[in-house]
Amino acid sequence: MAQHTVYFPDAFLTQMREAMPSTLSFDDFLAACQRPLRRSIRVNTLKISVADFLQLTAPYGWTLTPIPWCEEGFWIERDNEDALPLGSTAEHLSGLFYIQEASSMLPVAALFADDNAPQRVMDVAAAPGSKTTQIAARMNNEGAILANEFSASRVKVLHANISRCGISNVALTHFDGRVFGAAVPEMFDAILLDAPCSGEGVVRKDPDALKNWSPESNQEIAATQRELIDSAFHALRPGGTLVYSTCTLNQEENEAVCLWLKETYPDAVEFLPLGDLFPGANKALTEEGFLHVFPQIYDCEGFFVARLRKTQAIPALPAPKYKVGNFPFSPVKDREAGQIRQAAAGVGLNWDENLRLWQRDKELWLFPVGIEALIGKVRFSRLGIKLAETHNKGYRWQHEAVIALASPDNMNAFELTPQEAEEWYRGRDVYPQAAPVADDVLVTFQHQPIGLAKRIGSRLKNSYPRELVRDGKLFTGNA
């Protein structure tokens, strides 16, 4: 594999020599950092099993190597990446997999270790959504996830990835993560804090990642991380699990942050060792039971993961002074909800008791029941999935609801050819050779729902959202 030139500040190299255990070679570390990062994907088990995915993609000649800490994760090698980017494959467009760095799959593996089955989870720094979507798959779309992102520009990307993967149990917020300890104390069974960091572990992906690095900036970042983990710990219920992770390598932003939390709450913090998380985990194990992953150990990004349990309650923080504002939604009455459910079933959309119908003006939404306890405590950017808009003749079903709720085995499902599916993703109307019978057509490809179309004569009117329309080469190889 070709090498690339990474910029290393001298002070960084000195720090790494001190931080690296004697069992590891510093020369191996430098060599690993110079190698480009292996690409990796995670199969979205909300839509397809790993076995079915492997069978579906077998004809492509992809080399898929299992990732030890994630059953649905694979390193991927392809011969035709230049001809067809991985993100333009049919399987990616329909949400069958997520392009995710292998080491970033570790925190969620740790969160669900030992058969942990949380019902209400928070992802404190969620964009672009790799870990939120991984959490949702582990929860099988049950329970509820609060996915927070401080950067306004990244909330849109976060929602797009959640929608593409067919996820229905997520509420999005846009806050500084330091507010949650006061706003929603002891409300979560599990919390993932993948903290903002100096990014020392990503040099294989970005050779210039350390251009602005300095020991002083590490100290400033660590101070913010301590405030974030303190807030997250307050938001965690007694008995709950907190996973703290970063993509950096210095001890100040990693071990020291966790040790600070334990020193602050000595009777409430228990470190849960991760040495048995997967075969070979002990190669990265620290004496506290954390995983400090240098890039040469597993040939991946540098990463850090710690798992903690909150063993007892701690003193509450002062209540926040901000006002949440009026919640603009109201629950749909049972009788009307039954009518809506029946109409939705007619076009192949079904949901279970984990979701409840709410209304705002002419909009119909499905919210995860597990998030209702947070209403009035935080302001949501987006909650659940938008099911439909009502109009005089019935309902205008929404694309995200189709992707999350539709059954490809429904009576109105219509399977497209590869050429027809590509036209659909380009936002064009489709003229199938054999016209479907139904007026509202659930469009599928590879037995996966990809949208809802109106049949007008021999034409299927495209309803694919404009912001998702793709140009350039797609999976049939035509531009």
From Swiss-Prot:
**Broad class of enzyme this protein falls into:** transferase
Q: Which reaction does it catalyse?
A: cytidine(1407) in 16S rRNA + S-adenosyl-L-methionine = 5-methylcytidine(1407) in 16S rRNA + S-adenosyl-L-homocysteine + H(+)
Highest taxon of the lineage: Bacteria
Q: Which GO terms describe its molecular function?
A: RNA binding; rRNA (cytosine-C5-)-methyltransferase activity
Chief localisation class: cytoplasm
Q: State where S-adenosyl-L-methionine binds.
A: 125-131, 149, 176, 194
Q: Does the keyword Methyltransferase apply?
A: yes
The EC number(s) attached to this protein equal 2.1.1.178
GO BP annotations listed: rRNA base methylation
Pfam families xrefs: Methyltr_RsmB-F, Methyltr_RsmF_N, Methyltranf_PUA, YebU_pre-PUA_dom
Name the UniProt key words of this record, in alphabetical order.
Answer: Cytoplasm, Methyltransferase, RNA-binding, rRNA processing, S-adenosyl-L-methionine, Transferase
The UniProt entry annotates the active site at 247
* PANTHER family named in the record: 28S RRNA (CYTOSINE(4447)-C(5))-METHYLTRANSFERASE-RELATED, NOP2 YEAST -RELATED NOL1/NOP2/FMU SUN DOMAIN-CONTAINING
Q: Which family does it belong to?
A: Belongs to the class I-like SAM-binding methyltransferase superfamily. RsmB/NOP family.
The UniProt function text for this chain reads:
Specifically methylates the cytosine at position 1407 (m5C1407) of 16S rRNA.
Q: Please state what the protein is called.
A: Ribosomal RNA small subunit methyltransferase F
Native organism: Escherichia coli (strain SE11)
